[in-house]
Structures are given as C-alpha cells and as structure tokens.
Amino acid sequence: MLGGGGVTGGVYEIGALRALDLLAVNRTVNQFDVYVGTSAGSFVASLAANGVTPEEMMRVVNQQVPTPFRDINMGTVLKPNYVDFAKALAVMPLRTVGVLRELASNVGNVGLMDLVFGLAEGLPSGMYSTEGTEKYLREVLGDPDRTNDFRSLENELYLTATDLDTCERIVLGAGDWDDVPISAAASASTSLPMIYKPVELKGRQLIDGGIRSTTNVDIAVEAGATFVVVVNPLVPYVNDFQKVIPTMLGSRVRRVADMGFPQIGYQSFKLLAHQRLHEAVRHWEEKYPGVDIILIEPDPNDELMFETHILDFNKRVDIARHGFESVTLKLAEDYERLREVCARHGIEVSATRVRKVVKRFEEERESTAAWRRILEQTTGALLRQSGQA
C-alpha cells in the first residue's frame, strides 16, 4: 500500500521498495497479490503492478541510460493548466467589473478577502493539469509487456480518488470503475486540489485520493490480503530546535513559521493526514484480526523530508535514500518480529545482505554515486559486488 506526498513521496516510496526487494530473499515487490495506491502512490503502484522494478523506476527518475522507458521530468509532471487560464483571461475583466460594482454598494463593510472570494469563480481550477502524467503513463503502460487495463493485470490494482462534489472515496479498479484506464485513474488520484485541476471520469469530478483517506488498508484486506506493507511518506516534522537563524540581535532557534506559508500549510496537511492514519493504526489489530500489517514511514525529525517541497525533482537521490533507510531503520528497531511476521507468510528475509550491500558501497568516497548504484542496480548485481553471490 503506497500513500501520497507528491514527487517527493513517490521517490521516497521507490527507495523503500528497493530496500524491501533487497531484504526479501525469495520474493520481490513485484510479486504482491494486491497493490493499493493513493495520490503519488498510485503512480508507483501502477508501475509495480505492471512488473516495473524499483531499480528500473529509479533509473528512469534519475534519467540514467539505459532505461526501460522514456524518462520523466518536471515538464511532464507540471503541465500548466492552459485551458483554464485562457478561460480566466477571457472572463476576468467582466468578472472584476461586476464584483467591484457589487462591493461598491457596501463600502466600509468589505475587505480584501471579499474581493478575493468574489473573483475566485473566475480563477482556474488548478495551476497545473495532470494531462502530462496521464499521457506519460499511458505510453509506458502501452508497452506489449504491460497493460493500461485493470482487468488484464495478473495481480489486483486499486487506486483511490475523492469525488469533489459528494466527498465519496472512489476505488478505481473495483466494481463499476474497473473499465477506467489505469493512466486516467492514476491522474485522478494524483490531482492535489489547487495545484492540479480536478479530473473528470464518468461525469464525476475527482481529486487526490489522500484527501479522503491516507492509506486505505481496508481495500487490501477486503481483497483477501493477510500481509500488508504500508509505505507512508507523509509525516509531520517535529522540530528539535537545533537549527538557528540570524536576527538583528544575534540568533534564535528556527521555527516552522519562519519557513513561509507553503511550509505552514504543508505541515498542517501532513499533521492531519498522519493523525488520521495513526488513529486507524491503533485499531488495526482488533479491526483486522489475522492480518499482519507493517508500517514504514520517515522519522519525524527528518529535516530533508520536511524541507523538500512535494514537487521538488532535484533531491530525488537523497529522498530515495531516505526511503531505503526507513526500511533499514525498521529492521534495526524490531528485526525479530519482522522476520517472524514475514515467515508466517512464506517470505524469507535477510538483514545481513542489506547491511553488507550498504557497507560495501558506503566505503566509496562519493556517497551520492554509491547510493545511485544501490538504488539503480539489480539485486543480483549488488550481491555479486558485495561478495554475497
């Protein structure tokens, strides 16, 4: 199960999947029976369900040749919403005159926000369109070895979106929604409000699935899953007050409020999503008896995950490394329990080979290059180079 978090969250998930692939001796992350994706996780889940490995995804993200398909860039992810902007330019002059006339009759009782909300209906429904990512995913899944049809997959894939008008959770790939192309479903699931315009499918206006529910464990359980791995990149930052900023009188500790309104909004959104998730976590055991659930997420003191905005493409290697390290941290915290849980489901895991691979490459002088090799090379190649095969 893969949650949201924009480009940053998606790359974090690729790193986590890479570590899980290396950890499991007799399975790969492409052999799960059920994949559930929400927001950015829907993009990654769509590729994984189609057999694309984490290292192949990372090679594409890093634009490393050879790649299994065309690389992705910010021009694909951030395609301006030209249609809505054109409409706004056409109607805004008349809209402005009408709003000003209406407000003029009530001078003294109006403020700036009255003007903003008065003009809002003439503004675009989002700065960007998901048309670029939909087209890209459609091309990738159009390969003869892959499919853009939920019904043609060997495993099960479910992507969630939210109906903007009714507030319902829409499970794309299930019931009446299984005939929607996977690429269209993923574009709807990733339509973060105000950033991206809503996506219309079957007459419904759909937005980011993470708005309604963060991870959707119930979907996997209802599909018959008894072992569920949840990767959640959305964790609010817990300030340790170690960083300082200069002031006229010297310096003081840095606070989230110093980072501007985008980070304040992002922190608030992650806090709500994380609180909702962990409220659900507390009831997982009694709600889903007989189901083993493992949760993987960043450390709350992880400054890189917090400072990197959700559409930042430049820090992808570092973010993927953090995803990888979240899995190794999970190993360090409770390896015996993890090993026992995996064994119950016929999965053999080895912390030793993960440690040996990381140790082998961390000895190199250039850390970024070493981590790129860990993230981009096949498991077999890594094991051979670390003397384990």
What are the residue ranges of the model-derived segments?
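Patatin-like phospholipase
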Residues: 1-38, 43-389
